[in-house]
């Protein structure tokens, strides 16, 4: 599926996006295309993929059930009945001004389409992650959002991808994806395994005390 123009199936990018995701029960991915993120992230209770291309929806494959929606992303997102435990990941066509390639999407975006999408995303009352190349337009429209830049490798070489998001990352939903990059993830994994071994070697009373202390931290006490 990496053949899709704009695919996120590039070195380190999928992991970084998934690691950023906060806890959620419903996952909505717009502009699904090849669905690189949907295919690689653990499933939510409900998973929804949106695309204007019927061909992309028909060809999309995933190890778990996904509701495939043939619709304009901004219309679906504006009309969806949000319950408070959703996460939206939005990967629209790159802005023309940021592209280094002449390749085009089957269903492309003009600037007014980007502005309409941003208007909808800003109004959503749930966590949103938006990806693209660094853009002054996005920075200005999403001035109150946080952002993160990543160096990734694609068919054209090394490019800078940018993520914009409307929440404060404070906990990782899936431990296997924790970390800024592969090296950081391996460091965290080794540290977690070391702490797990130490915890397993403790007497029951000490385990209980440590567990109570950790739960107090998570509760903000």
Report the location of each language-model feature.
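Class I S-adenosyl-L-methionine-dependent methyltransferase catalytic core
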Residues: 1-221
């Amino acid at each position: 599926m990496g053949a899709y123009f704009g695919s996120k199936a590039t070195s380190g990018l999928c992991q970084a996006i998934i690691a950023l995701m906060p806890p959620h029960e419903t996952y909505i991915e717009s502009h699904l295309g090849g669905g690189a993120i949907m295919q690689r992230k653990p499933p939510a209770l409900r998973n929804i993929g949106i695309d204007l291309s019927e061909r992309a929806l028909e060809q999309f494959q995933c190890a778990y059930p996904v509701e495939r929606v043939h619709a304009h992303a901004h219309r679906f997102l504006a009309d969806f009945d949000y319950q408070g435990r959703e996460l939206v990941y939005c990967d629209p066509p790159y802005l023309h001004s940021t592209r280094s390639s002449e390749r085009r999407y089957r269903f492309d975006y003009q600037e007014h389409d980007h502005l309409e999408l941003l208007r909808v995303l800003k109004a959503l009352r749930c966590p949103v992650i938006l990806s693209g190349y660094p853009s002054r337009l996005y920075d200005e429209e999403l001035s109150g959002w946080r952002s993160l830049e990543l160096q990734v490798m694609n068919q054209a070489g090394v490019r800078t991808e940018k993520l914009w998001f409307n929440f404060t990352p404070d906990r990782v939903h899936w431990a296997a994806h924790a970390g800024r990059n592969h090296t950081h993830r391996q460091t965290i994994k080794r540290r977690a395994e070391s702490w797990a071994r130490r915890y397993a070697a403790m007497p029951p009373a000490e385990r209980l005390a440590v567990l109570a202390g950790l739960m107090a931290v998570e509760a903000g006490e």
